[in-house]
Swiss-Prot record:
Record organism: Pseudomonas syringae pv. syringae (strain B728a)
Highest taxon of source: Bacteria
Subunit structure: Part of the 30S ribosomal subunit. Contacts proteins S9 and S11.
The protein, known as: Small ribosomal subunit protein uS7
Keyword RNA-binding set for record: yes
CC terms in the record's Gene Ontology section: small ribosomal subunit
Classification via SUPFAM superfamilies: Ribosomal protein S7
Family statement: Belongs to the universal ribosomal protein uS7 family.
Keyword RNA-binding tagged: yes
A biological process term (GO) from this entry: translation
Function: One of the primary rRNA binding proteins, it binds directly to 16S rRNA where it nucleates assembly of the head domain of the 30S subunit. Is located at the subunit interface close to the decoding center, probably blocks exit of the E-site tRNA.
Length: 156
């Protein structure tokens, strides 16, 4: 914990093409080694592929996919008298989005398509339909929280 003051949160500028702040944040998650132009090309390429295949607003599908991936509860380890319990806790809205974006990018990278844009497009479309590896991850996290509901009285 900082001794002085908590650093102020900086606002992310809207992305130039769609004017969406959440998409700009997502580009930052895709970006590696500070290469923002590459990240933009990947994300815009993926959204174009989604538009081609689904014939609908790609931003709408992107937001639908994020909603399908974002977890409502997660487990945190809490030590009580020599035993470690997995305590279910609600996820803050900002962390929900961050986790959803992280999982989306991670599982897109593990897919088999040739380019990252194609992988990302595939994972986005799968997530919007309620399937795919990122949605499975969310379900696993929810299952863990449900299994450890008995320890929810050890709140933080």
């Amino acid at each position: 914990m900082p001794r002085r003051r908590v650093a102020a949160k900086r606002d992310v500028l809207d992305d130039p093409k769609y004017g969406s702040q959440i998409l700009a944040k997502f580009m930052n998650h895709v970006m590696e080694s500070g290469k923002k132009a590459v990240a933009e090309r990947i994300v815009y390429g993926a959204l174009e592929k989604v538009k081609e295949r689904k014939n609908s607003d790609p931003l709408e599908i992107f937001e639908k996919a994020l909603d399908a991936i974002a977890p409502l509860v997660e487990v945190k380890s809490r030590r009580v008298g020599g035993a470690t319990y997995q305590v279910p806790v609600e996820v803050r809205p900002s962390r929900r989005n961050a986790l959803a974006m992280r999982w989306l990018v991670d599982f897109a990278r593990k897919r088999g398509e040739k380019s990252m844009a194609l992988r990302l497009a595939g994972e986005l479309m799968d997530a919007a339909e309620g399937k795919g590896a990122a949605v499975k991850k969310r379900e696993d996290v929810h299952r863990m929280a449900e299994a450890n509901k008995a320890f929810s009285h050890y709140r933080f």
